[in-house]
């Protein structure tokens, strides 16, 4: 009994949580994890017959803030800066890239605003595809003491708060095809938007996907593990110390051989009763149809015979 109490006490000192743990699913939080697209960038070209129509309305619509314009170009913000559109046919031809780029956050658009973006811009484009998709999970769990690890070799950057606990973690590099952010969403809402979350804890796990990774959005975290390792399940104190050092000193991983890295990563997964990534995959599976249909709606070939429930002001 005394050994068990000592074990739990040491576990609290090392990990910040008790050794008696339950998975997110067991805690009844699974249905409270939300998943959505937090940013979308659609690129393509104008349907030739629609170019002049769009340009004329961009220059006259009071919901659009025109920043630059010319014979075959324009830049604008729409819907109170919720949407950014850039079009430059000459530059696209000279640089071999798409003519028009439409950027927006679906979470910030109401249904009527979403329809406005569709009708004004997306429905008038051809050869549409995604150059960027941000997939975001909002998790009502305190991720300060979770250990995040990838099976792949990726750069990791961690920023700590005043309590010396992690507040933001980055995996990868910004211009890569996949860039991962994990941060304290509750704190961000309070400091940036002056909003209070109803949850005791709220963290965001966000995948910024570019180029070819936009086609693999539903597989973007198959190599990622968000874990609660149980150090004390390892009998050898020397082995405990090595794993603790690797998990708390990022640079330590660069000092060991590849085969040793594989062995210790495997060991960390084995001693973790909870892998939050499993819960994220379950949530994504349940929402996959809805998310797929949403993406399809942005790039589907459309016709201008649709009726929309908004006033198209000129």
Where are these regions (language model features)?
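Structured, helix-rich domain cores that form ligand/interaction pockets
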Residues: 1-256, 271-314
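Helix-turn-helix DNA-binding segment
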Residues: 261-266
